[in-house]
């Protein structure tokens, strides 16, 4: 019953017109009136922001804010893998032989997430990490490793919530939502960085031009809170011993090591 009611409410409100109206509003000067309340409600750390709160002219500018230089030091340990985002690690687990993962009791197919069995094949029996960005988080995405972009592609159109309720009751948002996948190679192995759009403000913007990425380099940003899924090949990563789910992480913090 709860699942049915949740999905009904989402379908009634989640359509292209409402998304366009919200996008127009958040980019308008009128939205600036909400900035002080937004910052207070979501307890945004203003000390870290590149600009003073009053200098953001729209909510959109605040959503995609940059941070002061040096605010997010990048772990430089050899072969370390860093968190690409400020987020909550919602889940960590093994990718099954049939390409399925289980997140919050719901089964997802990474073949569906990536768009094909061929794309998913290299990640079978590997590891997945789910990183959820709330509206309070810094929304820019950074490369978790140094490596070379092998492929980049987008899938899906519409997006549903990717918060805990969305993961529990939604229509497989991790594999159905609009998403942009960047596959990076390093040490002879691959990592898939799956950037998943959020309900209403369904936007992911790439900011890197080169196929060569440096660990910690900015690669994209979300226009609103969303989710990043990291997929690793079998035996390609050793998690840092302190990493568990759920827990908060920030850009640049070590989450593991490439083997």
From Swiss-Prot:
Keywords: Cell membrane, Decarboxylase, Lipid biosynthesis, Lipid metabolism, Lyase, Membrane, Phospholipid biosynthesis, Phospholipid metabolism, Pyruvate, Zymogen
Positions of the catalytic residues: 86 (charge relay system), 142 (charge relay system), 226 (charge relay system), 226 (schiff-base intermediate with substrate)
UniProt record, GO biological process: phosphatidylethanolamine biosynthetic process
Membrane topology: Peripheral membrane protein
Biological or metabolic pathway of the protein: Phospholipid metabolism; phosphatidylethanolamine biosynthesis; phosphatidylethanolamine from CDP-diacylglycerol: step 2/2
Domain of life of the organism encoding this protein: Bacteria
EC number from the UniProt entry: 4.1.1.65
Main localization category: membrane
GO cellular component: plasma membrane
An MF annotation (GO) of this entry: phosphatidylserine decarboxylase activity
InterPro entries in the cross-refs: PS_Dcarbxylase, PSD-B, PSD_type1_pro
Catalysed conversion reaction: a 1,2-diacyl-sn-glycero-3-phospho-L-serine + H(+) = a 1,2-diacyl-sn-glycero-3-phosphoethanolamine + CO2
EC class name: lyase
Modification note: Is synthesized initially as an inactive proenzyme. Formation of the active enzyme involves a self-maturation process in which the active site pyruvoyl group is generated from an internal serine residue via an autocatalytic post-translational modification. Two non-identical subunits are generated from the proenzyme in this reaction, and the pyruvate is formed at the N-terminus of the alpha chain, which is derived from the carboxyl end of the proenzyme.
Subcellular location: Cell membrane
Entry-linked HAMAP family: PS_decarb_PSD_B_type1 (MF_00662)
Similarity annotation: Belongs to the phosphatidylserine decarboxylase family. PSD-B subfamily. Prokaryotic type I sub-subfamily.
Function: Catalyzes the formation of phosphatidylethanolamine (PtdEtn) from phosphatidylserine (PtdSer).
NCBIfam families assigned: PRK03140.1 (NF002853), PS_decarb (TIGR00163)
Quaternary assembly: Heterodimer of a large membrane-associated beta subunit and a small pyruvoyl-containing alpha subunit.
Name recorded for this polypeptide: Phosphatidylserine decarboxylase proenzyme
Organism in which the protein naturally occurs: Geobacillus sp. (strain WCH70)
Gene expressing this chain: psd
